[in-house]
Regions:
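A conserved FAD-binding loop/helix module that cradles the flavin
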Residues: 24, 475-499
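Active-site/ligand-binding neighborhood in enzyme catalytic cores
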Residues: 104-223, 230, 436-452
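A glycine-rich dinucleotide-binding beta-alpha-beta segment and adjacent secondary-structure elements
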Residues: 166-181, 348-359, 413-480
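Mid-domain catalytic core of redox enzymes
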Residues: 204-205, 234-369
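Active-site-proximal substrate-binding core of FAD-dependent oxidoreductases
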Residues: 232, 238, 499-502
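Conserved FAD/dinucleotide-binding core of flavoprotein oxidoreductases
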Residues: 267, 271-274, 303, 372-403
Length: 502
């Protein structure tokens, strides 16, 4: 079946009637802010966000304990979260409330919007930099001064510097990994605070993430757009350095009235759509060297008779209704760092360093599963698709299901094979069905290293969505902000087009 939306995908994959999001799951409140503003019907058309009781948390096998971060919906002041954090550190609980107050402030939100919904050249405007300076005293007051060490730090270092409790460090670092960051990579410490503050805000789309694609399609069709799902593009038509249309693989041509926009990977854009003959050596070389072997994931869906019932629920029943729940051997973020190390080597870590997260959307939205049943999903870092052959991946997918069930059952005794109705095994190798994710199956398209983010994503020459070809623009997950299901990349491209075209 050919569906629009790319990784905004939902399928009845584990068993008939059980919906699973095969790629994007986390939706943050700001993801579609410009769309809700400009097209209020977007919500009614299906992009309706909801939250679990707890936005994030983790259960720890050795300690037989847990940590829970309540969602904004169920804990708007974050007092309940602070109470849970205080079980591990009173100091962290106090600082958590300061962070939440800072995060809710107008000054912080203005800076956030500046950095999210502006292309690279707009983000260096004096008024943008002035708003950052105005925020600085509030950061210091809350205990998050972005000094030289923080700016140079990895997520691992910054989390350990900011929080006393290893349990809270684990939650923050594990979420950074879900943001496609290798938590050992330096130069990102200024964003670790945002990772922590986002934990109560984690949302999902009722009915499945593919609802986003349907809603966007409806708006676009109403505004005169047409879609062609069986028309592979071969090349951009370039005349005198200007894009004047596209040539399809069957030889037919489609002329452009004003411009052409690509959402391909940078490699597809430069070497397939444009052609190497139109690129200078420096840009071609940089695109050739882009890194995309990290954040390749195991994404499984499980059709269940019963929702997981965690041992930690005897201490707090709300842990059963947690969105991004880490299944950890113990409360030490070092496990996440080790898992990243092994992934960089193209290897699997020892089982004690596995750091899966799991969730059960059917506990909040019954549309995900038949009455009385549930669907659960997981995410875990894996080696890139290129690390193994097809035959090896088939065996790995079987083996990983056994390993994950063994870990899960330690924390939730009812998660045995008798509780499983069906299972969908989605791996980095399976991600290759999306051409733009080849050859490694990374969910983020590009690694989020310090030299492939913000004004350097994907390269400085392409970061502002312009290409070497006039009237040919580019966007997608390989552009800022990247590695999410939101609208930042598209909206920022629109701003550049509006600036250029008038």
């Amino acid at each position: 079946r050919h569906e629009i939306g790319g990784c905004l995908a939902t399928e009845e994959s584990a068993a008939p009637g059980f919906r699973g999001n095969t790629h994007a799951n986390i939706i943050l409140p700001w993801y579609f802010a410009p769309i809700y503003r400009d097209f209020p019907e977007f919500w009614e058309y299906g992009v309706q966000l909801d939250q679990h009781i707890c936005g994030s948390g983790a259960v720890f096998n050795k300690e037989q304990d847990y940590i829970a971060i309540y969602s904004e919906k169920h804990d708007p002041t974050q007092e309940r979260s602070a109470k849970e954090i205080a079980r591990w550190s009173e100091k962290d609980a106090e600082k958590w409330l300061k962070l939440w107050a800072l995060w809710q402030s107008d000054e912080m939100q203005r800076v956030q919007v500046d950095m999210l919904f502006n292309p690279a050249e707009f983000r260096i405007a004096p008024e943008v930099l002035n708003r950052q300076m105005e925020l600085y005293p509030k950061l210091v007051e809350a205990g998050f001064e972005p000094d030289a060490m923080v700016l140079a730090a990895s997520h691992m270092k910054a989390a350990r510097d900011s929080w006393e409790s290893k349990a809270l460090q684990y939650c923050v670092v594990r979420f950074a990994l879900s943001g496609a960051y290798d938590v050992n990579e330096p130069g990102v410490g200024a964003t670790t605070m945002g990772m922590a503050a986002s934990l109560p805000t984690l949302c999902f789309v009722r009915g499945g993430t593919h609802q986003v694609a349907h809603a966007a399609h409806q708006i676009l069709v109403q505004n005169g757009c047409k879609f062609f799902t069986h028309a592979e593009v071969d090349k951009a038509i370039i005349e005198d350095g200007t894009a004047t249309g596209i040539k399809l693989s069957d030889g037919s041509e489609v002329r452009a009235r004003k411009l052409v926009v690509s959402t391909l990977s940078p490699q597809q854009l430069c070497f397939d759509l444009i052609g190497r003959e139109h690129l200078d050596y420096k840009l071609a070389r940089r695109v050739e060297q882009l890194e995309n072997k990290f954040c390749c994931l195991m994404w499984y869906s499980f059709a269940l008779h019963e929702a997981p019932n965690y041992r930690a629920a005897s201490m707090n029943p709300d842990i059963n209704d947690t969105f991004w729940l880490g299944l950890a051997e113990d409360a030490d973020p070092w496990h996440v760092a080790v898992e990243c190390h092994y992934s960089r080597l193209g290897q699997w870590p020892p089982l004690e360093h596995y750091c899966p997260t799991v969730w059960t959307h059917s506990m909040v939205d019954p549309a995900y599963a038949p009455p009385g049943k549930h669907v659960a999903q997981n995410e875990q870092l894996a080696p890139p698709a290129s690390a193994h052959s097809e035959k090896e991946w088939l065996e790995i997918k079987r083996r990983y299901a056994e390993e994950l069930m063994g870990i899960w059952q330690k924390h939730a005794p009812n998660m045995d094979w008798g509780n499983i109705i069906g299972i969908d095994t989605n791996s980095p190798y399976d991600n290759l069905r999306m051409k733009n994710l080849a050859p490694n199956g990374s969910m983020a398209l590009l690694d989020r290293t310090a030299y492939q983010v913000e004004g350097a994503r994907p390269t400085p020459e392409l970061a502002n969505h312009r290409t070497p070809i006039k009237n040919l623009y580019a966007t997608g997950a390989a552009w800022h902000l990247g590695a999410n299901a939101g609208s930042t990349e598209a909206y920022n491209c629109y701003k550049i087009i509006a600036t250029d075209q008038g």
